[in-house]
Amino acid sequence: MRKRQAKKRPLLPDPKFNDQLVTRFVNMMMWDGKKSVAFKIFYDAIAIVDEKKQDEEKTGLEIWKDALSNVMPHVEVRSRRVGGATFQIPMQIRPDRKVSTAMKWLISFSRKRNEKSMAGKLAAEVLAAAKEEGAAVKKRVDTHKMAEANKAFSHFRF
């Protein structure tokens, strides 16, 4: 194990929107170190969101941020062994973990969609999540239901 926790390295903001959150998302979406490909997919997806949006006063990036906040879980369950039995204990999530979990879900459920390109898949999932629907939002709802169902075990906190 480490002697001390590793320092968080600062992320460079992305070139188009000058936003660190976008860079974090692109880094998670990137495969095989192909960052330029991941950036192209993200920017194309935001352009598609801009075309298909119903809300005229919001930009594609704002819709993406709304979608991200709609997917963010507030509680999660963690396994803990107590006297031979394993309990699912509901726990609050740290703010940085909320964001990274939401990003992971948005990316993974985008990849499972049936659109032609990854940009199309991501755009469709972002638009769905912004409207409080889609697989990523369903995952958040299921996680919250699981935490609610196991509320009785919350006194076993870590």
Swiss-Prot record:
Entries under SUPFAM superfamilies matching the protein: Ribosomal protein S7 (SSF47973)
A molecular function GO annotation: rRNA binding
Pfam family, one: Ribosomal_S7
Keywords of the record: Ribonucleoprotein, Ribosomal protein, RNA-binding, rRNA-binding, tRNA-binding
GO biological process: translation
GO cellular component: small ribosomal subunit
InterPro entries the UniProt entry points to: Ribosomal_uS7, Ribosomal_uS7_bac/org-type, Ribosomal_uS7_CS, Ribosomal_uS7_dom, Ribosomal_uS7_dom_sf
Record field: transmembrane: none
Similarity section: Belongs to the universal ribosomal protein uS7 family.
Subunit structure: Part of the 30S ribosomal subunit. Contacts proteins S9 and S11.
Chain's role: One of the primary rRNA binding proteins, it binds directly to 16S rRNA where it nucleates assembly of the head domain of the 30S subunit. Is located at the subunit interface close to the decoding center, probably blocks exit of the E-site tRNA.
Protein name: Small ribosomal subunit protein uS7
Organism lineage: Bacteria, Pseudomonadati, Bacteroidota, Flavobacteriia, Flavobacteriales
